[in-house]
Amino acid sequence: MNKIITGMLLILSLPTAAQDFQGRIYDAYLRGRMDLWKETMEQMERKAAIEKDPVLLYELTEVQYGYIGYCLSMKQKKEAERVLEEAEAQAKVLLEKGIEVPRVYSLIGAFYGYRINLQPIRAPHFGKKSEEANSEALKRGPREPQAWMEKGNIEFYKPAIFGGSKTDAVPHYEKAVRLFEESPGRTDRNWVYLNCLAGLGIAYEETDQPEKAGKVYKKLLDLEPDFKWVRDELYPDYLRKQSRD
């Protein structure tokens, strides 16, 4: 009997799998440990394949979104394309099930953006598709912060010759941050929120608003003093630029 009670208490004391996965992803993001991110992502893939849980499938797709972006930044295009194909297929399933529809359309818009990186010759086609998916996200969720963040990304990274504008990206990032902070639970150990704040800081720097950029970086370090990307790269680089100026 004691063994049964002990086992039941152990089960009750454990976090849910989704909570555990998200906590590990968040910690990997803070520490800049993409090896741990990938390891957790692969565990999520195996669990999602067995359980067919649509909530877990959405969380996995979001984690893959972050991993693909990292792979592209590291010029690991084959790995990026492999995971992107999986994520795109999962996004279709999520739409069919009606799970987190505005967020899913936001991710689809980002996936088309990744396609531009992989197939630059088709940039006009994928760029249009990205904007269409983002418009659908905003139509279905006008207060969805991730939709506004991705709208900011589209404007920020689209070449000026095709109508992109870093200046126009700033208010979209600002609105995304505001909506994250107005939405209950959306800032609690959420790597996407931190990423959005970092994107806003970078956009401020790129549009000659250094004072605002500095405030964003300080805010990030107040929230998470051990956020490696900001602590070791973004903020020190910002301070060096300011000392030269």
Region locations from a protein language model:
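N-terminal leader/linker segments that initiate helical-solenoid repeat arrays
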Residues: 17-74
